[in-house]
A protein has these predicted regions:
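A short, surface-exposed alpha-helical micro-motif characterized by mixed small hydrophobic
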Residues: 55-57
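H-loop/switch region of ABC-family ATPase nucleotide-binding domains
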Residues: 49-50
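ABC ATPase nucleotide-binding domains
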Residues: 86-107
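H-loop (His-switch) and adjacent beta-strand-loop-beta switch element
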Residues: 62-75
Length: 107
């Protein structure tokens, strides 16, 4: 489907759960391709994801929803905060820094 999206040559690309049913290898590959579209072609990409760790690795900004409402939005480093994510998910969250990116550890 990436070829169809590129053929349309729009400035904005909206994707609803593009990683659904992909294994981890293919999910990472997809996110790397999308990241290149941003960096090399100047595309703005909005993606619905349910994996906060995937978002933290590839997104410039995150909009977090809770109960159908915007809970928080901002740069990835602003959203990837343990207290904010614990409130969002209603579970204790610990963050680890791996290669300069934050990863959630669910406890």
């Amino acid at each position: 489907f990436i070829a169809m999206v590129l053929a349309q040559d729009t400035d904005f690309i909206l994707l609803d759960e593009p990683l659904n049913n992909l294994d981890i290898k293919q999910s990472v590959s997809m996110m790397q391709i999308l990241r290149r579209l941003v960096e090399e072609l100047g595309k703005t990409i909005i993606i619905v994801l349910h994996d906060i760790n995937m978002a933290s690795q590839y997104a410039d900004e995150i909009v977090a929803f809770k109960d159908g409402q915007v809970f928080s939005k901002g740069r990835t480093d602003q959203i990837m905060q343990a207290d904010l994510l614990s409130q969002l998910y209603e579970i204790p969250i610990t963050l680890a820094d791996i290669n300069g990116k934050k990863i959630c550890i669910y406890s």
